């Protein structure tokens, strides 16, 4: 068995599409860049509003994976997603890495990193449906399918659950607290 990567921590932000993971991460990123690394996901989808990722073709993704440039990757919704290997370097250097990942890769991450912190973001179905419609990435039947999709890792425990029906600051501050706790840094007040 390969030795797990540390001494830093990997904060895995998980939750269904439309719960606000990217917004919470952007909020926390602005307030924790000194202690945390937020790698851009590599996705086989063109860039668009509301998601900061590295758009690549299927061929580019496969080549990056074969060259070992991805720490972890997974297929979802007809696309492929990956976290750059810079995550391994940062965790190995003692930093906190924060990434939006699929719940389906949590066991793989637990085997890869010495310290895995799982943050599950949830929101009411009504708010989630509104957010998915506002995003405009898919037609109404696709939104219904997303709302009905079961959890791919129902048995995996979350270390923190953020109910993201409130303000961005409410949820963002909860995520920030998790990141700073993982880094052993104090939460600034005021």
Swiss-Prot record:
Transferase in keyword set: yes
Gene3D superfamilies assigned: P-loop containing nucleotide triphosphate hydrolases (3.40.50.300)
Chain intervals for the UniProt region annotation (Disordered): 135-159
Pathway(s) the chain acts in: Metabolic intermediate biosynthesis; 5-phospho-alpha-D-ribose 1-diphosphate biosynthesis; 5-phospho-alpha-D-ribose 1-diphosphate from D-ribose 5-phosphate (route II): step 3/3
Record keywords, A-Z: ATP-binding, Nucleotide-binding, Transferase
Catalyzed reactions: alpha-D-ribose 1,5-bisphosphate + ATP = 5-phospho-alpha-D-ribose 1-diphosphate + ADP
Record flagged with keyword Methyltransferase: no
EC number: 2.7.4.23
GO BP of this protein: 5-phosphoribose 1-diphosphate biosynthetic process; organic phosphonate metabolic process
GO molecular function, one term: ribose 1,5-bisphosphate phosphokinase activity
Task performed by this protein: Catalyzes the phosphorylation of ribose 1,5-bisphosphate to 5-phospho-D-ribosyl alpha-1-diphosphate (PRPP).
Family per record: Belongs to the ribose 1,5-bisphosphokinase family.
Protein name: Ribose 1,5-bisphosphate phosphokinase PhnN
